[in-house]
Regions:
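Conserved N-terminal segment of class I S-adenosyl-L-methionine
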Residues: 1-117, 121, 125, 135-138
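Short conserved AdoMet
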Residues: 50, 132, 146
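A short His-aromatic
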Residues: 126-130
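Conserved phosphate-binding and hydrolysis motifs of nucleotide-dependent enzymes
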Residues: 59, 148-149
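A short glycine-rich, Lys/Arg-flanked "PGG" loop and its adjoining helix->strand segment in the class I
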Residues: 136-147
């Protein structure tokens, strides 16, 4: 099934105001069981995280996990990357409109992306099953983690 047309349609409705975007994030949290598990694991990880925290959301999509993490941890520096430039632009616009200066989004192909020892945590949800060169991506993730990350 092709999800991009559905995502585009949803985006055109929910991107019209910050309020609707937040409603959309809440609906995703309610409809997708994995959201509950991801938020739980991020909370557990955050309870032991110290110092300056940098997070990479690899395959950030609509940015719902970046919204969650930046809401709970405003001191974290969060970078979302994706291959869909339209979603990157939408996310940058939304997070700018709501004043979340600790979150940014950029284009990145995960098979070639590394940012040496930059991140304490790398989150990648519903992404790896779409990438044939998954071993290369995990090598890149490892190279991008800070020591102990």
């Amino acid at each position: 099934m092709q999800y991009d047309p559905i995502k585009r349609s949803l985006g055109s409705v929910f991107n019209s105001t910050p309020f609707l975007r937040k409603v959309f994030y809440r609906l995703l949290d309610l409809l997708l069981l994995r959201s509950w598990h991801i938020r739980r694991e991020v909370r557990k990880w955050a309870s032991t995280a110290t110092g300056d925290i940098s997070v990479l959301d690899a395959g950030s999509g609509f940015g719902q996990y970046d919204f969650y993490m930046s809401s709970k941890n405003p001191g974290w520096k969060i970078r979302g990357v994706d291959v869909k430039e339209e979603q990157i632009a939408d996310c940058n616009a939304f997070f700018t409109r709501i004043g979340r200066r600790n979150v940014s989004f950029a284009f990145a192909d995960l098979t070639a992306f590394t940012d040496a020892s930059a991140y304490n945590l790398i989150l990648s949800v519903d992404v790896m099953e779409h990438i044939l060169e998954d071993v290369a991506v995990f090598r890149n993730f490892h190279a991008s983690l800070k020591p102990g990350g």
